[in-house]
Amino acid sequence: MELNVTTLEGNAAGSVQLSDGIFGLEPRKDLIQRCVNWQLAKRQAGTHKTKGRAEIWRTGKKMFKQKGTGNARHGSARVPQFRGGGRAFGPVVRSHAHDLPKKVRALALRHALSAKAKDGGLIVIDSAELNEAKTKALVGHFSGLGLTNALIVDGAAVHAGFATAARNIPNIDVLPIQGINVYDILRRRKLVLTKAAVDALEARFK
């Protein structure tokens, strides 16, 4: 598929040929969902914790005699039935991460890129560079391109001035090509790739 290339100023800068094997697939929601779940599970802290009955400090003395009181037969005040007792089957500190094959992750990324291209949310610019690291100037460029909620992916390294100017703009994320991922692609309305990013993706998946 062929896509027009623009500059940050909104001027035409030719066109680029995109591989159908990366940007022209019929998106599979199941693959994309698996990859997003994998990413979110991996980043979850897992620091939740409650105390069980073995971790509660209370006397071990029997609360009252076994028979003759009319009450249920209790032997410990640490059980979950009582206020201040231990939690039954409560959460413990653990990792929520699970495995996902590398081939599935790579395929999900291609389907996420294809989904953006199919929905018209893919924009290719010639480069992401600024002479001055001025947020106001970059906001003007973005408004000209109609970008209010976007992920911008550059080549191997993001231009320092561009990254500095963009970090104060809400709903705008900037990543190098190594950081491109399914979740960040989907959470923004537009995906903006530089020509360097397109070349890197073509080389990665060829």
UniProtKB/Swiss-Prot annotation:
HAMAP family: Ribosomal_uL4_B. GO terms for cellular component: ribonucleoprotein complex; ribosome. Part of the 50S ribosomal subunit. Keywords: Ribonucleoprotein, Ribosomal protein, RNA-binding, rRNA-binding. It comes from the Bacteria. Belongs to the universal ribosomal protein uL4 family. The keyword Lipid metabolism does not apply. It comes from Nitrobacter hamburgensis (strain DSM 10229 / NCIMB 13809 / X14). One of its GO terms (molecular function) is structural constituent of ribosome. One of its GO terms (biological process) is translation. One of the primary rRNA binding proteins, this protein initially binds near the 5'-end of the 23S rRNA. It is important during the early stages of 50S assembly. It makes multiple contacts with different domains of the 23S rRNA in the assembled 50S subunit and ribosome. Forms part of the polypeptide exit tunnel. This is Large ribosomal subunit protein uL4. The keyword Ribosomal protein applies. NCBIfam families: rplD_bact.
